A protein has these predicted regions:
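Conserved class I S-adenosyl-L-methionine
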Residues: 1-5
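A short His-aromatic
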Residues: 73-75
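A short acidic, Gly/Pro-enriched loop at the edge of an enzyme's catalytic core
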Residues: 57-64
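Class I SAM-dependent methyltransferase SAM/SAH-binding core
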Residues: 10-55
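SAM-dependent methyltransferase
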Residues: 99-177
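C-terminal lobe and adjacent flexible extensions of AdoMet/dcAdoMet transferase-like proteins
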Residues: 167-212
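A short glycine-rich, Lys/Arg-flanked "PGG" loop and its adjoining helix->strand segment in the class I
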Residues: 82-94
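A conserved beta-strand element that flanks and buttresses the S-adenosyl-L-methionine
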Residues: 66-68
Length: 212
């Protein structure tokens, strides 16, 4: 199997532990190294490669290819998305299944009042052991369909520590369907959650099970 945008090995860990024939591609060399350290007790942990998912070439085909946790949404324009999907197709055979996991855009999320910050998570800092709170603000461009997000990190006394900025392309189901069909994929299933319930108007997720 092949995971694209494999990150720090969050999904790879259980797959490799259970003996899967796993390969991961990750753009960040730092994330790839963290994944290898996490998985170094397993013989196939070195199959995590640094590469660009828009232009990779592995000279083999896989039974299963997947991209999880909204990573597809970091492809911010049609050229990047088309290049990615073209690369995926070159690594598929007639029985390959390709899984894409993204969230369904929510207008309440996209069109927040400017400057509003919404709590998204809390975690314990590994060094200071203090609780760090993260709040999110965003600005959505309806023409480009790109959502620019800022995460604001606060300590437990509400002092701002730092911010992180990132952008995500928003795909509504109709646009996603058209993109996949135009790129030559068969949509076998569209699920709205991890329990494989059919995608509907209230689904928070879009999970696509695809073939050639």
């Amino acid at each position: 199997m092949l995971e694209l945008a494999s990150g720090t090995g969050r999904l790879a860990y259980s797959l490799i532990r259970d003996g899967a024939d796993y390969t991961g591609i990750e753009l960040s060399s730092q994330f790839a190294e963290l994944a290898k350290k996490k998985l170094n007790k397993y013989s196939n942990s070195q199959n995590i490669l640094v590469g660009d998912m828009r232009s990779f070439k592995l000279d083999r085909k896989f039974d299963l290819i997947f991209i999880g946790f909204n990573s597809f949404l970091h492809l911010l324009n049609d050229n990047d998305a088309n290049s990615f999907l073209s690369c995926v197709k070159k690594h598929m055979h007639s029985q390959t299944r390709f899984i894409i996991d993204i969230f369904t855009p929510n207008p309440l999320f996209l069109y927040r009042p400017e400057g509003i910050q919404i709590p998204v998570l809390e975690y314990s800092d590994s060094v200071s052991k203090k609780i760090i709170k993260v709040e999110e603000s965003n600005k959505y461009d309806i023409d480009s369909e790109i959502n620019d997000l800022t995460w604001h990190f606060y300590d437990d006394e509400a002092n701002i520590l730092f911010t992180e900025n990132f952008s995500m392309k928003m795909y509504f189901p109709s646009k996603m369907n058209q993109l996949l069909i135009d790129n030559g994929f068969n949509i076998l299933n569209q699920w709205g959650d991890y329990y494989k319930m059919p995608l509907n108007d209230t689904s928070k997720l879009q999970i696509y099970n695809l073939s050639l």
